[in-house]
Amino acid sequence: MSEIRFDGRVAIVTGAGGGLGRAHALLLASRGAKVVVNDLGGARDGTGAPSSEMANKVVEEIKAAGGEAIADAHGVDSAEGGEAIVKTALNAYGKVDIVIANAGILRDRAFHNLTEEDWDKIFAVHVKGSFNVVQPAFRIMRQNSYGRIVVTTSNAGLYGNFGQANYSSAKTALLGFASTLELEGAKYNIKANVIAPVAASRLTEDVMPAAALERLKPELVSPVVVYLCSEECSVSGNIFTAGGGYVGRAAIVESKGAVLANPTIEDVRDNFTKISDMTGAEEFSNAFDEVQKRLMAATQTGASA
């Protein structure tokens, strides 16, 4: 089969100064994309003065390999920063076709020690940061009737993790974000998907043993992300997991449940096994489809408040 190429496409990769973002940017550029390499250059917890040093190094790597890229050091945690990142792409290359929202920080603490600042900063970078960059790019994609968006969740966002109530919550928020982009972008050939990577990076270097990190190279995740950014990708609103050579799909599903007319507390207790049984669980494409299921149950039982 033919090689997947990105000639003529313009991509923005946030948090691309190292780790996953760097790997994504290098792979896109190697396949012909013009890449905006965005990285604030701060510390892992989001502190430190902005610097383009990390982004510049990745741009140098791309150019040395014959690719085309430009560095950007704006922060994603403000609307002005997001607009500026997109303007960097427009000024350099005239359009935006692809956004990989990868920028992230960590401020891990056990829940009882978590501060409001720790909570707010994580949401500012991961959730608002994705919004700040994707929205101005999305407007351009609508005008051009083409776009590919990949936002980055985490297995912590899917399943939770000790000491990461802020991070897990922010990463879960991005699932609903991407699902809505799928619905609103469908008419304009905009595909939005979610990646849940497990990879060695600044964010994981002291979380996993060195032997495990060696097997979890970012380069093993990037082919999945870059495929989702390609014209050949036909799916949208999906969650994919990747790491260590494993690639899978995750989904939010709902059990068949139990239909209970005007249920009492005891009815819930007596049917709890059936309610909780995930055999034959269903996946819904949007919120309305799930509501329809409940309305059908209400019609069958004649339930009332």
At which residue positions do the language-model features occur?
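Active-site helix of classical SDR
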Residues: G21, V134, A170
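Residue(s) in the substrate-gating loop at a strand-loop-helix junction
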Residues: S154
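Canonical Rossmann dinucleotide-binding motif of NAD(H)/NADP(H)-dependent dehydrogenases/reductases
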Residues: E3-V37
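A short, exposed helix-loop element centered on a Lys and neighboring polar residues
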Residues: V134-Q135, S179
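C-terminal helical subdomain
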Residues: V194, A212-T301
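A glycine-rich helix->loop->beta "capping" turn
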Residues: F6, A65-E68, T88-A101, R107, ...
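Substrate-binding pocket helix/loop in short-chain dehydrogenase/reductase
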Residues: I62, A110-F111, D118-D120
